[in-house]
Amino acid sequence: MHCLRAIVKGKVQGVYFRDFTRTQATRLGLCGYAKNLANGAEVEVVAEGDKDALLEFLDLLRSGPPRAEVKDVETSWETATANYSDFRIKH
């Protein structure tokens, strides 16, 4: 199992980005969370699962849902913790 941490930047709040993220993560069998950051222009995403699924997920994060305007995605690969049983939206 692998862990992807991403900070998605741009017009990603108020455009259903976190819901899109949860839908895609669930479809790919990933666990973790998506959370709006306080600056109003970034979403933090942590996802754990199969490497191929995470790479597909990363491509989806780079495009986002129709109303989003993704400007950049900062990524890091970390050690998976297996602390997640599903994919959630954090507030």
Curated annotation (Swiss-Prot):
Domain Acylphosphatase-like residues, every copy: 3-91
UniProt-listed Enzyme Commission number(s): 3.6.1.7
Highest taxon above the source species: Bacteria
InterPro entries in alphabetical order: Acylphosphatase, Acylphosphatase-like_dom, Acylphosphatase-like_dom_sf, Acylphosphatase_CS
Keyword list, A-Z: Hydrolase
Record carries keyword Glycosyltransferase: no
PROSITE patterns: ACYLPHOSPHATASE_1 (PS00150), ACYLPHOSPHATASE_3 (PS51160)
GO molecular function annotations of the record: acylphosphatase activity
Active-site residues from the entry: 18, 36
Keyword match Hydrolase: yes
Catalytic activity field: an acyl phosphate + H2O = a carboxylate + phosphate + H(+)
Family membership noted in the UniProt record: Belongs to the acylphosphatase family.
PANTHER family for the chain: ACYLPHOSPHATASE
Name assigned to this protein: Acylphosphatase
Organism from which the protein derives: Dehalococcoides mccartyi (strain CBDB1)
Lineage, opening ranks: Bacteria, Bacillati, Chloroflexota, Dehalococcoidia, Dehalococcoidales
Gene that produces this protein: acyP
